[in-house]
Amino acid sequence: MYCQTYGFNATEYSRTIPGHQFSEFVVRYALSLRCETNCSSRDIVTAIKKLAELTFGLVDNIPSYNTIDNWVRKCGLDEINHASQAFKDGDYAVIQDECMMIGSEKLLPVMAVPAKHQGRPLQLSDVKVVRFHVRSGWDAQTVSEALKESAESMGKAPSYVITDNDGKMRKAVALSSYTWHRDISHTLAMFMERTYMEDSDFQNFSNDVATCKRQNCMKEVAYLQSPSQRSKARFMNLSESIEWADRMLNTYHRLTKREREVFSFLPMHSSFIEEMKDMVSCIHYIESQMKQQGLSKVTVAVCERHVCTTIMRGNDRMRRVGQLILDYLAKESQLLKDGEVLNNSSDIIESMFGMFKYIQSPNKLNGVTTLILHLPVRLAFADGTASRNYNVKERLCKIKIQDVTLWRDENLIENQVVKRIWTLKSA
């Protein structure tokens, strides 16, 4: 039977994949649910059981949750093995970040993205995982070695490397003799932190907001409290708190007497809130230009003009941040060729590992496991059409579970939970 709407042969999909007990339809359905939804493997088993009841024979066998995860692991390993194919006809850039610490293990992923800006912000479907590196700790030398290994697996060196402002990342890129572009969001947040972190006005405002929230979190006015801030990298999400403060000031005269008493500290900080509002607005403008239009001499000039006409006309603190931004833009411009439009944002890495944190074990002793191989498959499915075009049969026939085990032994650290089980079992 041929489905004209989707362009596939249903009879072909119902056949068992060679060397497996399940049809291509079941495998494809399970992969789609695992990679395109938030379904757990156990939820998918339940969904396939219900599908078997409703389709009267289309589904013969029901896979276990571990079987489903093994399918994803195999496909993920194949994605890593063939990452270079996505850039065989074009240049690529590397995004690298020591982004996760699970237990005592630090994960250093190396991701490849198109070197040329695509006329839009980077999307998950643009990213290919080149390597996953895991160690108990990283320094500039080991990060540099990881970069070189990744370049060897890709068959050519990256056009440039995007990282945050971590000192060891900067040194590692220099040791590897690659061009380094600093992530725009981390860099601007760093400039804000340098200027405002120890500033008395900022500290007083932050303390008043925190005290108000702590004292009134369970009272009637709790619905008006400020949004929660990240404990780390707080200067990367200042906008929500500043927007809240600005809205509260604008609506202050409409609050009840009790509410005005609770938030009476806000009018005292009105000039500082207005200053921060202007700072956040300028930073968002620069980030939007760089992410939407790409890093080029044109966007650098546009951003420089905007800084000069906004925050450089403000007070001493604003001008200090403005000068840091102008110096940063000038250095980035020196690395560019005429007409060159590049990426300089690593925001995509936050989205990627937000997905992984959802499926990883809450037990920190597990560290980084082969579940990390789910990530390359989720990226492959990110464009929404892969569920129809993804060659499941070829990947499962090509990659064996022994290959996954070998990859684990070569790339991951010994699982502490397994070590604990075997140690206590032998007691």
Question: Language-model segments: what does each one mean?
Answer:
Residues M1-T16:
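Basic, low-complexity segments
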Residues T16-F22, V26, S32, E36, ...:
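RNase H-like nuclease fold core
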Residues Y29-A30, M355:
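A general alpha-helix detector
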Residues I44:
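Short alpha-helical "recognition helix" segments of helix-turn-helix
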Residues T163-L175, T211-A427:
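Acidic/histidine-rich catalytic cores and adjacent linkers
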Residues T187-C212:
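Glycine- and acidic-residue-rich phosphate-binding/metal-coordinating active-site segment common to enzymes
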